[in-house]
């Protein structure tokens, strides 16, 4: 199964331009490519991968599906396991990355992230870091985002979870969470000046990783929606702006 670059994810300077852009059907499935909101000059060629010894390529994945994902139940720091679909998604991720020489694989310490990474890694070293774990969301953990079942949570959580200083009654504020993730991604980057690594983390964690690398505002970062089976590629090299793509397969 060959990996292909999607059209680059365009980063614009005007926060008002945050939107989802529907890509051409022959490149992208029904999901829209995300248009982030800060300008980057995106110059890359799939054939040129690996030519620069100073380029660090970060493959950024989200863990496979869990039953709580299906139920729209808020997981946060609760340790939930992959379901059968999630394990199949992890196996497909391993297939997609087959042939890519990875130097290391990173996951959080939560089972859904770590088990996804275990399925993918083969004999590549796995490093599980608590700093990559999902945001702790206090009293909302375990509750459903369903207006018919729990209308209070469905109304309260979306608003409070976007407040940068709200610790959600025993959880982490977005500012605290961002600092945790930023420190962790800086540590990871300090270990790899070049080569290729895989990070398997969580929805909000990955938002904060992209925020740290691309210097996004908080509203820009939390507008990102990465599905359980979506894979991003970040390229970093000295003297150039970071570059971001969503990777697709011929099956898409």
At which residue positions do the language-model features occur?
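Acidic, low-complexity terminal tails and accessory targeting/binding regions
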Residues: 48-56, 135-147, 190, 195, ...
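Short, well-ordered beta-to-alpha junction loops that form the rim of enzyme active sites
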Residues: 108-110, 131, 181, 200-204
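Bacterial N-terminal signal peptides that target proteins for export
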Residues: 5, 11-13, 19-34
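Bacterial N-terminal signal peptides
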Residues: 33-43
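Loop-to-helix element that buttresses phosphate recognition and phosphoryl-transfer chemistry
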Residues: 65-116, 169-182
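Phosphate-coordination/substrate-recognition cap region in phosphate-metabolizing enzymes
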Residues: 53-55, 91-156
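Short glycine/proline- and acidic residue-enriched helix-loop micro-motifs
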Residues: 155-176
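Generic beta-sheet signal
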Residues: 58, 188, 195-203
